[in-house]
Amino acid sequence: MEYNKLLADMVPGDRVEGFYILKEGAIKTSNSGKPFLSATVTDKSGSLDLKAWDYSGPVGAPTDAGKVVKIRADVTEYRGSIQLTASNVRMATQEDSYDVSALVPVAPIDRDETLEKVRSLIASMEDRDYRVLAETMLERHLETFRSIPAAKSVHHSFLSGLLMHTANMLCLADFLAGQYSQIIDRSLLLTGTLLHDFAKEKEFTFSQLGVVTDYSRKGQLLGHLVMGAQEIAQVAAELGTPEEKSLLLQHMILSHHGEPEFGAAVKPMFAEADLLSQIDMLDSRMEIYAETLPGVPAGTFSSRIFALDKRIYHHE
């Protein structure tokens, strides 16, 4: 029996016991009519599916997502994927002792240095209206911006993921603004890039460890695009930002998913909005590669990745 082994290090045949985060889980009924737990557990190294047969609780309520559980399980393989077959699953208690830093994945960045890079790029914007709006909203969102994940599961779904994702995008935006300077307003592009996901702090609910557990009521009814555009309109009005500049930024937020089928309220209708959408897609997709490839042996293909709608190849 191995204790608190990282999920990424587990191989079929291992017997493990330890503490992990319940990402999601539900009690279901098998074909034979017996209850079982179907769940996903995570730690800082990744995630694995878990099954506990002939199991009716206590773990499995919707409110359990994001909490720490203790499991005892065999590591097995099913249809080419490693999973856990648990003989015991319970909620962690106050009497239990576990290392939180081993459970929660954190962005591989220096947060202070990355935030300073963001501040420097914003301070370098020539347009005062955009610069003041960007700096004002950054200060209002600072604590959550530097700490929350960028997504629930698809990309940058670790602590400080939003900071990492946004900083990456700002560097790309800065370069591309110079590359296409004849048509790109750099200050507009950088401001839209900074603000594009700020409303995710309202879109998600978070566990006590800071992990995204679900979409909030507002997140489901409105989404971060609409809430983000609404806040920009409000703050711009407070600051006296010209209406045209506020409108351009709102459009960038509402359109940054590119196509309605991907959640955009409208399609991008000017160069900076289109470029923001492309930059967002680029960094998101590259992060999916970065998170997937370490688990794919060189010279082989991954399983199908839903967000990419394909398998990917890990070349030598």
Feature roles, as predicted:
Residues 154-156, 164, 175-296:
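Divalent metal-dependent catalytic cores for phosphoryl transfer on phosphate-bearing substrates
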Residues 277, 294-295, 299-316:
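N-terminal intrinsically disordered, cationic/polar leader segments
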Residues 1-16:
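OB-fold nucleic-acid-binding modules
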Residues 130-174, 195-199, 203:
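A short mid-domain helix/strand-loop element embedded in enzyme catalytic domains
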Residues 38-43, 206:
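Short, acidic/hydrophobic/Gly-rich beta-strand patch recurrent on exposed beta strands
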Residues 20, 66, 169, 253, ...:
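Divalent metal-coordination and catalytic microenvironments
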Residues 25-35, 48, 55-101:
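OB-fold single-stranded nucleic acid-binding module
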Residues 83-149:
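Extended, charge-rich, solvent-exposed interface segments
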